[in-house]
Amino acid sequence: MAKGKANLNLTYEAAIGRLEEVVRSLETGEASLDESLKLFQEGIGLVRHCHSQLDAYEAKVQRLIETPDGAAVVEERRTEEGE
């Protein structure tokens, strides 16, 4: 994969794996400023890609849990941040 660009054909799991690699590389502090910026840009692209995939999966799950009369059974999601 080209540095600085997220591969949008990656599975969610592969994208998370690559994101973990990017984070480890940035945490070492051994990359040059230019390389760090490229890694950061790649990481942002991977995060956006993963978020998009999760949104799509959430929509699919929502369709699957609709009741036969067309009403959706939705439970409020709770997060640690109180969103």
Curated annotation (Swiss-Prot):
It catalyses: Exonucleolytic cleavage in either 5'- to 3'- or 3'- to 5'-direction to yield nucleoside 5'-phosphates. The keyword Cytoplasm applies. Its EC number is 3.1.11.6. It is found in: Cytoplasm. This is Exodeoxyribonuclease 7 small subunit. The lineage of its organism: Bacteria, Bacillati, Bacillota, Clostridia, Eubacteriales. Keywords: Cytoplasm, Exonuclease, Hydrolase, Nuclease. Belongs to the XseB family. GO terms for molecular function: exodeoxyribonuclease VII activity. Heterooligomer composed of large and small subunits. It is an enzyme of class 3 (hydrolase). InterPro entries: Exonuc_VII_S, Exonuc_VII_ssu_sf. Its main location: cytoplasm. GO terms for biological process: DNA catabolic process. PANTHER family: EXODEOXYRIBONUCLEASE 7 SMALL SUBUNIT. SUPFAM superfamilies: XseB-like. Signal peptide: none annotated. Bidirectionally degrades single-stranded DNA into large acid-insoluble oligonucleotides, which are then degraded further into small acid-soluble oligonucleotides. GO terms for cellular component: cytosol; exodeoxyribonuclease VII complex. Gene3D superfamilies: Exonuclease VII, small subunit.
